[in-house]
């Protein structure tokens, strides 16, 4: 029974890690025109097949017809929202969960989702 439970926990962890939040931005294409770059939402240009990280911690890739981006940030769920708060760190793309009254103490988080 413990082996089965352990296997389910490992499986659930991989499903959570692989279920990233992603979106696509279509490139403005003119029929007959070939382009070798993408323009992101901020107006920055990126060469085809290049990758970059946005200020909001999304990992993006420029492709011929679109830009595809996926979040790098796991979001905590299943914690005491009355006692604890989320703090987002853009430098390392992580959210920490700490006590509202004493931010030096971390809170227990039951699950993380992408």
Curated annotation (Swiss-Prot):
Superkingdom of origin organism: Eukaryota
UniProt-annotated location(s): Secreted
UniProt entry tagged with the keyword Repressor: no
Presence of keyword DNA damage: no
Entry-linked InterPro entries: PSP94
Annotated S-S bridges: 22-70, 38-62, 57-93, 60-69, 84-107
UniProt signal peptide: 1-20
GO-annotated cellular components: extracellular region
Main location: secreted
Keywords: Disulfide bond, Secreted, Signal
Family: Belongs to the beta-microseminoprotein family.
Protein name, per record: Beta-microseminoprotein J1
Organism whose genome encodes this protein: Saguinus oedipus
